[in-house]
Design a protein with these regions (language model features):
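Specificity-determining recognition surfaces
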Residues: 1-25, 140-144
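Short catalytic-loop micro-motif centered on adjacent basic/acidic residues
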Residues: 15-16, 46, 113-116
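Glycine/small-residue-rich phosphate/adenosyl-binding loop
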Residues: 25-99
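A generic local secondary-structure boundary/capping motif
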Residues: 60-63, 127-131
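Residue-level "edge-of-site" marker
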Residues: 46, 120-122, 139
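A glycine-rich helix N-cap at a beta->alpha junction
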Residues: 67-72, 130-144
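Small-aliphatic-rich amphipathic alpha-helix that forms the alpha element of a beta-alpha
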Residues: 33, 72, 87-128
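Short secondary-structure junction motifs
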Residues: 42-45, 112, 138
Length: 144
């Protein structure tokens, strides 16, 4: 499928079937995120894959998961951020958006639904998953 067709077919999914994501498909989605461009190729992302039902329940304390069986907690490493000198803007949020977009498009190509969530409580996610202070939970990517 050509890119524009793929981009047009990608849509937000807020109701998942409960179908498990195959390891091979998950690996392809994660690889798409790994090769996504980032400012100065800093690759600030650290991704936590959540599949066990008891861990999905931990995510649900911060935001609903709509029946997703796989949640990617997309974090950025803040220990060495790339800061724009003119106004102090960190490139990490933009980078994470690009990385998530790559993974959502890869999921769509595999006929897997997705939704990127930014409106969640990162403090809850940090606590539930023991995420250190220099790693910032930035987005949730729900798959199914």
């Amino acid at each position: 499928m050509d890119f524009l067709t793929l981009a047009k077919q990608r849509c937000t999914t807020r109701g998942f079937t409960g179908r498990r994501i195959e390891k091979e498909d998950l690996d392809k989605i994660l690889e798409a995120g790994r090769v996504a461009p980032s400012a100065c190729n800093r690759q600030p992302q650290q991704i936590i894959v959540v599949e066990k039902p008891e861990n999905i329940k931990k995510v649900e304390k911060a935001y609903k998961t709509f029946g997703s069986t796989c949640v990617l907690i997309v974090c950025q490493n803040k220990s060495d951020p790339l800061i724009r000198p003119f106004d102090g803007k960190c490139s990490g949020d933009l980078d994470i958006g690009i990385i998530c977009d790559h993974m959502m498009l890869a999921a769509r190509e595999l006929n897997i639904g997705s939704v990127m969530v930014g409106l969640f409580d990162p403090a809850i996610v940090r606590k539930e998953f023991g995420i250190p202070e220099h790693i910032e939970p930035t987005a949730l990517l729900l798959l199914g």
